[in-house]
Amino acid sequence: MAKEKDEALSPQQEKLKALQAAMSKIEKDYGKGSIMRMGDEQIDNVEVIPTGSIGLNAALGVGGYPKGRIIEIYGPESSGKTTLAIHAIAECQKNGGIAAFIDAEHAFDRFYAAHLGVDVENLYISQPDNGEQALEIADQLIRSSAIDIIVIDSVAALTPKKEIEGDMGDSAVGLQARLMSQALRKLTSTISKTNTTCIFINQLREKIGVMFGNPETTTGGNALKFYASVRLDIRKVTAIKDGDNIIGNQVRVKVIKNKVAPPFRKAEFEITFGEGISKIGEIVDLGVEYEIIKKSGSWFSYGDSKLAQGRDAVKALLKDNPELCEELEAKIMEAIADKK
């Protein structure tokens, strides 16, 4: 009798035994790793694809766009949404990755992409006829497990087949939202399993009749808002001029949603027409912010030596001295890492 009592399991042990049996069956049915206890394995750092901007890498908290996740980049027209996505493709290719671009807008500029560092010869591009075709192509590419990053430009251009085949005046309320909801339900687990970074570019619209609060909303319904791990809001701050000519824009990117690090951080940088994100401009600005470059009046100095007078002169100096530029970048990266 006493022996039976010793062998009797406590309620907690009974639970664990039942759980172990369930886990064994799940692993047998769906494969090893389909369920695990978080404490059994050390969680690795989040794998990322750099954004092409030092400041934005820091604002995202993990050093770039997380792999195996959905990213949404949205903002007003000509704010730099596609430029950000193209920079991500360039960074992915630099590290040996394979990239695809679903050009639903039929507006991809291969020469601009090449200027930004994209290997256009090895970029896979599709210009689909309708939204269903675009998302089906994206799904098949992701399922191949061969693609590291895929960009869909843009959600607003993912027009449902029914709307394209109908007449101009036909009502198509909610068709695109339903299409996005169905597609994202299907895509999410595949994106995670294949470790693909999926970037959706989206546009802004204004809700009619909103008296209070923000009337702005993104296209394609609410599904993307929920499924996206990272949402970036990009806006123009000021125009950059060379005399009377506008040569680019100063933009601000706000991390509206972030499931892998704290959200609501911001990054500001220059986007120069034809060249993309100004890395040297960022190095100057972040160098001053982290007190690596000292600014006194209009003079900039580094260590014991004066660099130049005026920000543009410093940028020109760093452009001609890549070693100094790399040294400053390394010190900025150290300062960002220490701040975390």
Curated annotation (Swiss-Prot):
Keywords: ATP-binding, Cytoplasm, DNA damage, DNA recombination, DNA repair, DNA-binding, Nucleotide-binding, SOS response. GO terms for molecular function: ATP binding; ATP hydrolysis activity; ATP-dependent DNA damage sensor activity; damaged DNA binding; single-stranded DNA binding. ATP binds at residues 75-82. One of its GO terms (cellular component) is cytosol. GO terms for biological process: DNA recombination; DNA repair; SOS response. It is found in: Cytoplasm. SUPFAM superfamilies: P-loop containing nucleoside triphosphate hydrolases (SSF52540), RecA protein, C-terminal domain (SSF54752). PANTHER family: MITOCHONDRIAL DNA REPAIR PROTEIN RECA HOMOLOG-RELATED, RECA. Can catalyze the hydrolysis of ATP in the presence of single-stranded DNA, the ATP-dependent uptake of single-stranded DNA by duplex DNA, and the ATP-dependent hybridization of homologous single-stranded DNAs. It interacts with LexA causing its activation and leading to its autocatalytic cleavage. Belongs to the RecA family. NCBIfam families: tigrfam_recA (TIGR02012). This is Protein RecA.
